[in-house]
């Protein structure tokens, strides 16, 4: 089902998970302020490797291309369960600024892969948990799966241990759920948030000291009995 968000851009509602791919704030707005801007403010190098969990409608990937540091090359790796969704993206009603990368959208829709001199995108159709074990290293992780309530397997301590093996400089996510933050905290990540007008808080995680407001998770640990999600099948 097509849904119009508050910034005028479109998203879809998943029948499987009964959730929209983006918040009501806006597909572009949420993507930029919770993922793209924070990530690129701390990662600026000749070649940037991004893990986009999961591909969905591709806003994270496409807006990364449109907003990447000027002289950087991007390698983007992204799992996605819904093969038919990817095939349909060539006709999705994206914002006008996406017109300049329509050739990329078309290529991905057909071949699940794109490469030119500055951009490489690989979409893996299947289980994200298996896919991340095939990767070597990543600079940025967009942790943007459906919510822990309905897509718990992509928010477990076992899952985040595999993410941690990739040594990301920053993990970005819309989630502020205590079990998610506790999993990252338990793995040695510093937890931050971002504060923009009219944008709900998310979580930024890094083992480095970053110039973002602290999430003050240690204070919360004094008031709660912490736990993290666990997937015994991982």
Features from the language model and the residues they span:
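Class I SAM-dependent methyltransferase Rossmann-like catalytic core
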Residues: 1-45, 57-70, 87
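SAM/dcSAM-binding transferase cores
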Residues: 1-3, 7, 114-117, 203-234
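The AdoMet/dcAdoMet-binding core of the Class I SAM-like
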Residues: 41, 46-136, 142, 196-200, ...
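A short SAM/SAH-binding and catalytic strip from SAM-dependent methyltransferases
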Residues: 139-154
């Amino acid at each position: 089902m097509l849904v119009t968000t508050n910034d005028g851009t479109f998203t879809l509602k998943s029948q499987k998970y009964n959730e929209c791919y983006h918040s009501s704030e806006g597909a572009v707005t949420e993507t930029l302020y919770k993922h793209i801007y924070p990530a690129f403010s701390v990662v600026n190098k000749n070649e940037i490797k991004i893990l986009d969990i999961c591909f969905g409608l591709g806003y994270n990937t496409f807006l990364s291309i449109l907003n990447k540091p000027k002289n950087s090359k991007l390698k983007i790796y992204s799992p996605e369960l819904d093969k038919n969704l990817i095939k349909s993206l060539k006709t999705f009603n994206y914002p006008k600024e996406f017109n300049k990368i329509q050739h990329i959208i078309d290529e991905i829709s057909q071949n699940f892969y794109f490469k030119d001199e500055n951009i490489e995108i690989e979409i893996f159709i299947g289980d994200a948990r298996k896919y991340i074990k095939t990767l070597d290293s990543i600079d940025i992780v967009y942790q943007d799966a459906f919510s822990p309530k309905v897509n718990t397997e992509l928010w477990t301590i076992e899952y985040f241990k595999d993410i941690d093996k990739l040594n990301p400089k920053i993990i970005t996510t819309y989630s502020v759920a205590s079990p998610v933050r506790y999993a990252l905290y338990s793995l040695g990540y510093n937890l931050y948030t971002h504060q923009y007008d009219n944008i709900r808080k998310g979580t930024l995680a890094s083992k480095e000291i970053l110039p973002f407001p602290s999430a003050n998770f240690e204070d919360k640990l004094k008031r709660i009995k912490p736990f993290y999600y666990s997937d015994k099948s991982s």
